[in-house]
From Swiss-Prot:
CDD domains: GDPD_YPL206cp_fungi. Phosphatidylglycerol phospholipase required for the removal of excess phosphatidylglycerol (PG) via a phospholipase C-type degradation mechanism. Residues 32-272 form the GP-PDE domain. It is a single-pass type IV membrane protein. It is found in: Mitochondrion membrane; Lipid droplet. Its EC number is 3.1.4.-. This is Phosphatidylglycerol phospholipase C. Keywords: Hydrolase, Lipid droplet, Lipid metabolism, Membrane, Mitochondrion, Transmembrane, Transmembrane helix.
C-alpha cells in the first residue's frame, strides 16, 4: 500500500525535525484557539447540550460537534453511526425516527443526557456570543444533510448570514462543497482530514475554505511544516485533533497550529499558555510518541479506506 506521505524512517527523523522547529520557534502573535472536541467530553457525556454548556463555561473558544441524519430527516448531534456506544441502544441512526423514538434515549454516562438535535444546539449557541460551532460532517452522510442543516438554521434565525460568524461546516470530502455552495453560500468551510495531499488538492486553495483540521499524528512528519506554512501563506488556519496528552499539544504548538481540539479544554488552555514549547521532545514520555506513531499508521489506513470507498 503506497501513500503520498509516508512516516519518517525512524523516530529520530521526526525528533530531529521537532527539535529544529523548537529551536527556531517564534513567539505566538496570539494564543491558539481552544476547541472543545464533542463539547467537554473529558467530564461530561459527549455531544450533549450539557457538554456544550460546560465547554463554554470552561472557556473554550469553539465547540466541535458531529451531525447525523435520521430516517425522518432530523439532523441530530451524534458521532457514531450507531447509538450503542453512547446511548446503549443498538440502532443505526439512519433507522431512527427521531420524533417517535428519541424520548427513549439517554446517555449511558451520567447524568444521562438526551440525544440533542442540531436545532437545539443552535438555540444554545445563540446564548453564547463569541463562541463558534464547528460542525463535523462525516463523509458517509447523505448530501441531503446540508439542506436539512440549513433548514434548521433558518428556523432558529431566518437570516442565514446571521450564522456566518457563529457556525462553520467542516468537511472530510470535497463532494460536499457543491451542496454547501448551493444551500449555505455564506457559511465558512473547513476541511477535516488525515492526508496533506488530499487537503492541498481539494481544500487549501479553495476560496471558500477558511482552514484545515488535521490529525495531530501527521505533524510528526518532517515535511508537515511545509504544509502548515503553505496553509498560512494562503491566510488560512491550521487546527490539530485530538490533543489529549502534553506531547500532542506540544507537537501542535511547535508546528504553529492555530487551533487545538481537545476533549479537555481546561487542560489544553493551561498547557498552551505554559512553558511547554520550551521543552525538548524527549521531555515527554516515550509512550505518548509511540501512541502518536500508531495514530499516524491508523490514520493512513483509514484514509486509504475512505479514498477507496467514500471520498
Amino acid at each position: 500500500m503506497a501513500f503520498n506521505y509516508s512516516i519518517a524512517n525512524t523516530v529520530d527523523d521526526a525528533a530531529q525535525s521537532i527539535a529544529e522547529n523548537t529551536s527556531s520557534l517564534a513567539t505566538f502573535s496570539k494564543p491558539p484557539l481552544v476547541i472543545a472536541h464533542r463539547g467537554y467530553k473529558a467530564k461530561y457525556p459527549e455531544n450533549t447540550i450539557l457538554a456544550f454548556q460546560q465547554a463554554v463555561k470552561a472557556g473554550a473558544d469553539c465547540v466541535e460537534t458531529d451531525v447525523r441524519l435520521t430516517k425522518d430527516e432530523v439532523v441530530c448531534i451524534l458521532h457514531d453511526r450507531n447509538l450503542n456506544r453512547v446511548f446503549g441502544v443498538d440502532v443505526d441512526v439512519r433507522d431512527l425516527d427521531y420524533e417517535l423514538d428519541n424520548g427513549h434515549f439517554r446517555t449511558i454516562q451520567e447524568p444521562h443526557e438526551p440525544l440533542p438535535t442540531y436545532e437545539q444546539f443552535l438555540h444554545e449557541l445563540t446564548k453564547h456570543p463569541g463562541v463558534n460551532l464547528l460542525v463535523d460532517i462525516k463523509p458517509v452522510n447523505d448530501l441531503l444533510i446540508i439542506p436539512r442543516m440549513v433548514d434548521a438554521m433558518l428556523r432558529v434565525n431566518s437570516d442565514l448570514d446571521f450564522w456566518k460568524d457563529k457556525v462553520s461546516f467542516c468537511l472530510w470530502s470535497h463532494r460536499f462543497i457543491p451542496a454547501c455552495d448551493r444551500y449555505a453560500p455564506s457559511i465558512p468551510l473547513y476541511h477535516i482530514g488525515f492526508n496533506f495531499a488530499y487537503a492541498e488538492r481539494h481544500f487549501v486553495m479553495h476560496p471558500r475554505v477558511k482552514g484545515v483540521s488535521m490529525a495531530v499524528a501527521l505533524f510528526l512528519l518532517p515535511h508537515s511544516q511545509d504544509f502548515v506554512d503553505l496553509v498560512h501563506a494562503q491566510g488560512k488556519q491550521v487546527f490539530a485533533w485530538t490533543l489529549n496528552t502534553p506531547s500532542s499539544i506540544y507537537l501542535a504548538l511547535i508546528r504553529g497550529c492555530d487551533g487545538l481540539l481537545s476533549d479537555d479544554p481546561v487542560m489544553a488552555r493551561a498547557l498552551s499558555q505554559g512553558p511547554i514549547v520550551t521543552k525538548s521532545w524527549h521531555y515527554f514520555h516515550y509512550s505518548e510518541w509511540l501512541h502518536m506513531i500508531y495514530g499516524f499508521l491508523r490514520a493512513q489506513f483509514v484514509f486509504f479506506l475512505l479514498r477507496t470507498f467514500v471520498l
